[in-house]
UniProtKB/Swiss-Prot annotation:
Family: Belongs to the Hfq family.
Organism: Marinobacter nauticus (strain ATCC 700491 / DSM 11845 / VT8) (Marinobacter aquaeolei)
HAMAP family in UniProt: Hfq
Protein name per Swiss-Prot or TrEMBL: RNA-binding protein Hfq
Protein keywords: RNA-binding, Stress response
Gene3D superfamilies: 2.30.30.100
InterPro entries (alphabetical): Hfq, LSM_dom_sf, Sm
PROSITE patterns in UniProt: SM
Length: 83
């Protein structure tokens, strides 16, 4: 798994499993709301009254309705910023 996915996948998976409502802002400013039904490397399925397939390259920001707790995966400090 590439380093770029080491945070993205667990974060999206937590949103999906806990059925946390999200607001997704697209790069063109449009705001979509719903729950993450599924996702893969390129798209997110967002469910509200209908299911929408949203391409990840079009997403600017994902804002959950409440805090998300991610499972601890590397207690040795891996995953922290490398400044």
């Amino acid at each position: 798994m590439s380093k770029g996915h080491s945070l993205q996948d667990p974060y999206l998976n937590a949103l999906r499993k806990e059925r946390i409502p999200v607001s997704i802002f697209l790069v063109n400013g449009i705001k979509l709301q719903g729950q993450i039904e599924s996702f893969d490397q390129f798209v997110i399925l967002l469910k509200n009254t209908v299911s929408q397939m949203v391409y990840k390259h079009a997403i600017s920001t994902v804002v959950p309705a409440r805090n998300v707790r991610l499972p601890q995966q590397n207690p040795a400090g891996e995953g922290e910023s490398e400044d």
